[in-house]
Amino acid sequence: MSEIFEPKNIIVTGGCGFIGSNFVHYVVNNHPGVHVTVLDKLTYAGNPENIAGLPEDRVELVVGDICDAELLDRIVPGHDAIVHYAAESHNDNSIADPEPFLRTNVEGTFRLLEAVRKHGIRYHHVSTDEVYGDLALDDPAKFTEETPYRPSSPYSSTKASSDMLVRAWTRTYGLRTTISNCSNNYGPYQHVEKFIPRQITNIIDGVRPKLYGKGENVRDWIHTEDHSSAVWDILTKGRMGETYLIGADGEKNNITVLRMILEAMGRDPEDFDWVADRPGHDRRYAIDSTKLQRELGWRPAHTDFAEGLKQTIDWYVANESWWRPAKEATEARYRAQGQ
């Protein structure tokens, strides 16, 4: 194992988004000596309420764009590391309009790497298992760090591009970097456009949930707090230049997840509508996190998916004021796409 890195001041890009804000909460709750600067553009998916109430002497919000090189030159000095979560990440949006994905996911990563190169700090790159493409439903294989890249959507192709930039800058310029590729996250603060919160909030509103295709597509679910603990372990204990896959053996097909949500909310498990499948919808994702567990000793804490799902449902029921402002615009966008 590498020498343990003990950062005192870190930048978290996208720290007002779903996964990024949960990482900020994790750091504040578990590592009291660390100060976090959140850099977030506050797009539709970034909500400052996600980090409201955290101690002001521990967390500072800088509203800005990761593509702004002058801004990065001002805020990066004095920090020990950047943890890069900021991304355009919704597949349906990438199909409708890929340009913002290229700018944020590719150019934004380039700008951050240049800032890291200039100021000599560490960098952890948060990525997705979607860069590997998909697996057959009857294939027992899982993605590993050696799986070839086969991105199949505008979103995943931009994330694959950003991963390659990190590797190239690491090799060419000697940057101190790590990369993680994670499976599908669930938990609090996730935007209502995403699969699980969309179903939950539709049921709260008395609207029949909608399911793509035949519902057979499989996702490997992980609670976002487990993702956060894994990223921290990789940042502080990971070997420089290495990639680690993060997963919790949470494979479920979409129809199973939807039926679990319906039953947990007291509804008939068949009370949903079928809609046309997403173009190019990946069939199955599955992560093998053996390397992460073996080298760094990481283990997921939220291994009961049904319990984690119940806690997530309870959070959305209790926090309608958080998700309500985005709900109508999100559903209008889905209606326009026939979904």
Label for each model-derived stretch:
Residues 99, 200, 219:
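Short alpha-helical segment that forms part of, or immediately flanks, the ligand-binding pocket
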Residues 161, 165, 169, 199, ...:
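Hydrophobic alpha-helix immediately C-terminal to the catalytic Tyr-X-X-X-Lys motif of short-chain
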Residues 48-51, 135-139, 190-193, 224, ...:
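Short aromatic-enriched loop/helix-cap "lid" or pocket-rim segments at secondary-structure transitions
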